[in-house]
Amino acid sequence: DVLKQIIEGYGYKTKVLEESIALAYEGLVDNDLTGIAISMGAGMCNICVMYQGMSSLSFSVARGGDWIDQNVANDCGCPVAKVTAVKENSSQLDLTKSAINDIYQEGSEEYNIINAIRSYYGALVNYLLTNLTHQFNNAESVPNFPDKVPVVFGGGTALVKGFMEVVGEQFNQEEFPIPVKDFTLVEDAHTAVARGCLSEAQLIEEEEGETKEE
């Protein structure tokens, strides 16, 4: 691995840490590192089920923000860059609003893009939760969670206004294999994974320091 060689060339030790596990270290710290962490990336979404600091299940789904952008662009007949700009910058985009609440005139390009983004966000969240349920049901070993668990989200794709409300609408507790306490967006979601990596690095450094003292 080229990046590993570069880092180690500067005298650092490297450790591979999955994106969703790093997010769990940051987002589940107030719940005894127990719960579900979902990192909503551009190319894919990464999921980790953690129990008391140990990852019991982790996987990825090959859909993310880019999947939304590409499908909206195809449906609306516009460049992907235009869709991305609307998704990331439009003050009118709110996933909780219906089409009739838009100030844009029906049929305008902006109007069509915003409503297509809403539709594909709902499809992405539904796909994500369906896959998570499937992974739970087919896993050989899943912890027996004694209490309801939190689900934390991070990553740029989760930053669109109204995203957490869409998650709540798509979620069906009766069909989900474990009880869920709540859904939250981790603070400063863009840097949450990096902070989780830092926490793990600091912990390793402390443990190595204690070993040397012994």
Q: PLM ranges: what are they?
A:
Residues C45-V49:
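Short beta-strand scaffold segments in enzyme catalytic cores
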Residues D1-A37, Y51-S60, G65-T84, E88-A123, ...:
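Nucleotide/phosphate-binding catalytic cleft detector across ATP-hydrolyzing
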